[in-house]
């Protein structure tokens, strides 16, 4: 069983037990898509709160999510990503709720979303952007969840790992497309994935390169084709996350 298969099997159990919440008022912040379109001179940063991962194990279990997020915001991050998976990433929806209460910028719910219940829960907790991972969904499931998220006035970051998945993301009209440099079946990371997939960019979407970034030189590799990078582990391991985040803001 691959990492992804194991995660999805557990996620089905988690979602089956999850209550269906009533839709509450949406948190007010700016559109991340509009922000990226308006701020093109620099590579923008999605900075992540992540305690652990299936491949690396514990990364920073003692982190204060709010303090970490506020450091990112002070560094000029355009959005905070919060892992909410409790089993494999040691996150929680409460982490997201607390972060969203304490920052002004958009918050991304980073999880393996397979149900509308998760979309509503994320919105109610303060997320204004949600992640849909193409490799975790059938084409019909992706289309339905994309429609449901849009109906909830959530922005959708559609994650791809290869050219076929990119074609599907562009076909459904995704405005935010993330290229994950991590293979979710093996969890191996290679920034060259983004460099390769970028050859097929053909829409008015904004593009985010995800995973594997540790230095400004890493970010420079994708700065021409991408609008932003998503960085988690490198920032979570650094004792001075604000400085670490600032160091990744390079010119495009």
From Swiss-Prot:
Pathway: Amino-acid biosynthesis; L-tryptophan biosynthesis; L-tryptophan from chorismate: step 4/5. CDD domains: IGPS. Keywords: Amino-acid biosynthesis, Aromatic amino acid biosynthesis, Decarboxylase, Lyase, Tryptophan biosynthesis. One of its GO terms (biological process) is L-tryptophan biosynthetic process. Gene3D superfamilies: Aldolase class I. Its EC number is 4.1.1.48. The keyword Lyase applies. It catalyses: 1-(2-carboxyphenylamino)-1-deoxy-D-ribulose 5-phosphate + H(+) = (1S,2R)-1-C-(indol-3-yl)glycerol 3-phosphate + CO2 + H2O. It is an enzyme of class 4 (lyase). GO terms for molecular function: indole-3-glycerol-phosphate synthase activity; phosphoribosylanthranilate isomerase activity. Belongs to the TrpC family. HAMAP family: IGPS_B. This is Indole-3-glycerol phosphate synthase. It comes from Listeria innocua serovar 6a (strain ATCC BAA-680 / CLIP 11262).
